[in-house]
A protein has these predicted regions:
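A short Gly-Trp-Pro
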Residues: 2-161, 166-291
Length: 291
């Protein structure tokens, strides 16, 4: 294969801070939206989109920044220790599965189905016509891990936690708003098609455990964009902006139904080329007029 062909067949991806990058060579397989509780926790989003390729066509750069959390032998999730973006980790059957939200270009592949819809977030509705499977689709022989256990809900309190359980938080009262954001920073930070964020008054959120396990990365050139994550497992966690009096909560981190659903899509001008918005929520190229 000539150098020009090699470039054409490769897709480049990177984490939010840029310290970890990777090249993934096609052909690609099994691009899917996963709704399992573990993906939701890890990414902080309603679902995670992954794409598979042969491991010998995968090249990772910046491995020194990568942290892997392994809840049990043979199962791990990897993330950038500086910014918290999810990055490709362990291989499966000669394949590496990469989060699609980190692509710098269009891989040319499109999601084929939704998996683990039996674990779907109660605040998210699947609006497209792709096939849906309660767990893995037929023909995929892989271990099915149970969703993280949950204790009974408490009236008036919305709880959340990271995937490993080191960090937990509670929110008193209703949120201010909830939106789906498609900006490039949110896609890189969450390693997903979009972020689903909920804003709450800063003094209504409290961390009940793991406050010392939180890392916050602020994009240097951004006025206010930052990502907070668990240093142990990399899960996206609420980011508190004290000067603005708000906390931005990744809805995938919630353990209880928040009593609200995202009201609109913002920054759709930056939408991932491989993702189609199929619902009827209002769409805004950038911030909504009332922001």
């Amino acid at each position: 294969m000539g150098r020009a062909e090699w470039r054409k067949s490769m897709s480049r991806a990177s984490c939010l801070c840029g310290d970890v990058t990777w090249d993934l060579e096609g052909p690609y397989v099994f691009m899917h939206h996963c709704h399992c509780g573990r993906c939701r926790k890890a990414h902080g989003t309603p679902f995670a989109t992954y794409i598979g390729a042969a491991e010998d066509g995968f090249r990772l750069h910046g491995a020194a920044r990568v942290t892997a959390w392994a809840p049990q032998p043979g199962v791990s999730r990897s993330f950038c220790s500086r910014c918290g973006s999810i990055v490709p980790g362990a291989t499966f059957g000669g394949l590496v599965f990469a989060p699609a939200g980190n692509f710098d270009d269009d891989p040319g592949e499109r999601p084929a189905d939704h998996i683990f819809v039996a674990s779907k977030a109660p605040w998210y509705a699947i609006a497209d016509s792709l096939p849906r499977f309660d767990a893995y689709p037929p023909g995929v022989d892989a271990v099915v891990l149970p969703d993280p256990p949950r204790s009974p809900a408490r009236t008036g309190v919305t709880r959340g936690s990271c995937l490993c359980g080191a960090v937990a938080f509670e929110i008193d009262g209703p949120p201010l708003l909830a939106r789906n954001c498609h900006c490039g920073r949110c896609r890189k930070a969450r390693s997903a098609a979009h972020a689903s964020n909920m804003a709450v008054p800063a003094d209504h959120l409290r961390f009940t455990s793991g406050g010392d396990d939180l890392i916050t990365y602020k994009v240097p050139e951004a006025d206010r964009f930052a990502q907070t994550f668990c240093r142990v497992c990399g899960s996206s966690m609420p980011c508190v902006y004290r000067a603005r009096g708000i906390a931005v909560v990744p809805m995938g981190a919630l353990d209880d139904p928040p009593g609200v659903t995202p009201a609109c899509h913002i920054f759709v001008a930056s939408r991932a080329p491989w993702f189609t918005i199929a619902d009827d929520l209002p769409q805004h190229d950038e911030y909504p007029p009332d922001a």
